[in-house]
Each structure stands twice: as structure tokens, then as C-alpha cells.
Amino acid sequence: MDLENKVKKMGLGHEQGFGAPCLKCKEKCEGFELHFWRKICRNCKCGQEEHDVLLSNEEDRKVGKLFEDTKYTTLIAKLKSDGIPMYKRNVMILTNPVAAKKNVSINTVTYEWAPPVHNQALARQYMQMLPKEKQPVAGSEGAQYRKKQLAKQLPAHDQDPSKCHELSPREVKEMEQFVKKYKSEALGVGDVKLPCEMDAQGPKQMYIPGGDRSTLPAMGAMEDKSAEHKSSQYFCYCCKLSMKEGDPAIYAERAGYDKLWHPACFLCSICHELLVDMIYFWKNEKLYCGRHYCDSEKPRCAGCDELIFSNEYTQAENQNWHLKHFCCFDCDSILAGEIYVMVNDKPVCKPCYVKNHAVVCQGCHNAIDPEVQRVTYNNFSWHASTECFLCSCCSKCLIGQKFMPVEGMVFCSVECKKMMS
């Protein structure tokens, strides 16, 4: 398929999740409706991951595409109908062994994802070492957390040009090369094993905090150690604490098998969230989630959340923007050369600011223009003018004077305050 056809087929899937309730705004949101080019809801401005959108198949397609043309093809299966790679995530059902007596129902726990290991006991141990609120038990807070992190850490628009907004043929080609490069140089999936299992594969360099990683203790010296001391020879690369004997550890092949992590320590070095499904990116001796690895390589547009492959873009408020996406967060009007105000780190044009965000003057009850000086005390504001910042009793101008605030009113003296009591 040539680049022109790829550009024509680009779409953001606006029907996907339409009407889904917002888990954050509740009834304040009328239901999810995807903005034309921003990755947010048009109604409440929250992201899709904040809405109760059923995305199991879509997420499996996204992760499947991520693993396509990599060494991790064992984690995907292609649908016979359209050849789309699907992520074969390992769903684990654990049975609680309490059904020895009659009339006792079997208690089962379903995990929406579990490490793909043959030893179910090892997988169970892995899950128990995660914070309870992050264990992906079906229907739980942990399952919702996993779903949110899949959307946040592995955005589809970081790997698939068809999920981006109006890329040029040159940008499509550059993005495809970028994706191919990070798949071959940085992408990996963690491996859960017992540290002692790695010893069976031959001598390994062991990471010891503060030690010389290039040398190994003499084998004779290692054999003389007690079992208790042996268990302390393994240290977590993240927290630097020792690993307990018999506990599972996570290895990352790209990092080298001399490094290992506690399950709860296998985190992105930037956002410090659990690496979803143990999918990591390795760079400069650090773990990254997909989003923050890409951020370390390319600028990201603060408007559309996509990586910028254009040679021309703008920088404002310590953020990067496509030229066409430096727009008012409320009305989408272009802000280049216009006055704007930052509201919650989002640029808003002057008319929208006055209409939707400006504080109201306690004196004249009109919105205060962002370019006009004002006086603020607690949650109350006034125009800093002789017409507005006045004593609520005698109308004396209080600019530069002492005043007494009382529930949105200001007084020049105790006498004036008493007269208004």
C-alpha cells in the first residue's frame, strides 16, 4: 500500500466508545464523544481512558501491532478474517482450594492479565507481590488501573500513522522508520523467573549496589556461603533491596540478566507507574514506558498528544505544538499572534477566558479582563480601580489603604463595618 493510500485511510475511530460515561466527571459528562483531533472527550475534556469504554479487542489489536515484526511474535495471533495481529494476553483463573466440604462453593479469581509462565504458583506469587489496588482482577480497581495504563503508556498514535491526524506522506514514512527503530533497539517484555533458575544457565554477573558489575565473586567463595547468605546476593535494580529466597523476580533481556527487579519495582523511570503487562523500553540503563520513551526521542504536541515528525513546530509555555494545533482549548481557534491565558496548563483565547474562566469583580459584578490589574483576597477579586475597590459602606477608595474584609465586602474602618452589620 503506497503512502497516499495510507494517508487517506487515517481515522481516529470517532464511533468507538461513543456515549460511554465518564468515571471522573460522573453525571456532569453527557457521555464520551471524541474530539476531532484531540484525544479527549468533547463534552468533559477528559481522556478516553477516564471513560468506561469497552476496549478489550481494540487494546489487544494495538498491543498485537506493537509486537508485529519483533521477536515477540509468540505473544500475537493473526485473525484469519483480516490478518490483524491480536495480542494473546495470558488470562489466568485461580481456584481457591476451599471446596473440601459439601455445600462450599469454589472461589475463583480471574486476572485479566498474568505473566505467561508455565508455573501457575509462580504467577500467583507475582500477583501477590503487586499492590492490591494494582492487581488486574476482573471487575476490580486493579483491572481499571491496567486498562488506564494501557491507554496512557502505549498510545496507539505512537506506533500507527493511521491513528494520527493528517500526517503528510513524508511524516508517515518518518514515523514508520521511527517505530521500526524502537522495536529493534528498545522494546522488550519482562520475564518472570526465580533468581536461582538463572544460575542454572551458567555464571551471571550479579548487580550489587555500589559494587563493580564487571567482576564476579570467586565460585569457591560463593559455594562457601550459607543458604541464608545466598538469598541476599540478589538485589533489586530499582530499590536496591535484597531479593527474598523463593520470590519471583523480573528480568529484562535488553538490560542484561545481571539485573533484576521486584514485581512492584518494575516501573517506568519517568512516571513511576507499573510497566503495564511488563512491556518496557530500555534506554541509557533505564526502564521507560512506551509514552515516555517516545518523549525522550521526539517532541510531543501538547494539543493532539501525537509525536511531532514535522520540521516546523512551535514552543510555548515549555510545551511543544504542531503549528495547526496551538489552539484555544475551549473553542479551537488558532492562537498564533493572539492574546491567550493559560488555564490548568491549557491555552485559552481571551474571549473564552472572559466568558468561561474569568473571576467576577465584587464591585461591578463584571468579569475581570486578564490584562487588567486586580485586587484579590482569599476567593474574592476586584478591579484595581477607583470605581470598584471601595469601602462597602462609605465608598471610600481603598487602593493602597488598609481594609477589613468580611464575606466578600471590604470596609475602611470598624465604624463602617458596624454600620453594615
Swiss-Prot record:
PROSITE patterns according to UniProt: LIM_DOMAIN_1 (PS00478), LIM_DOMAIN_2 (PS50023), PET (PS51303)
Residue span, LIM zinc-binding domain: 234-297, 299-359, 362-421
Positions of the PET domain: 92-199
Cellular component terms (Gene Ontology): cytoplasm; focal adhesion
Spans annotated as Disordered: 133-164
Subcellular location: Cytoplasm; Cell junction, Focal adhesion
CDD domains named in the record: LIM1_Testin, LIM2_Testin, LIM3_Testin, PET_testin
Keyword Endoplasmic reticulum: no
Assembly behavior: Interacts via LIM domain 1 with ZYX. Interacts (via LIM domain 3) with ENAH and VASP. Interacts with ALKBH4, talin, actin, alpha-actinin, GRIP1 and PXN. Interacts (via LIM domain 2) with ACTL7A (via N-terminus). Heterodimer with ACTL7A; the heterodimer interacts with ENAH to form a heterotrimer.
Family: Belongs to the prickle / espinas / testin family.
Task performed by this protein: Scaffold protein that may play a role in cell adhesion, cell spreading and in the reorganization of the actin cytoskeleton. Plays a role in the regulation of cell proliferation. May act as a tumor suppressor.
Protein name: Testin
Source organism per UniProt: Plecturocebus moloch
Lineage of the organism: Eukaryota, Metazoa, Chordata, Craniata, Vertebrata
Gene: TES
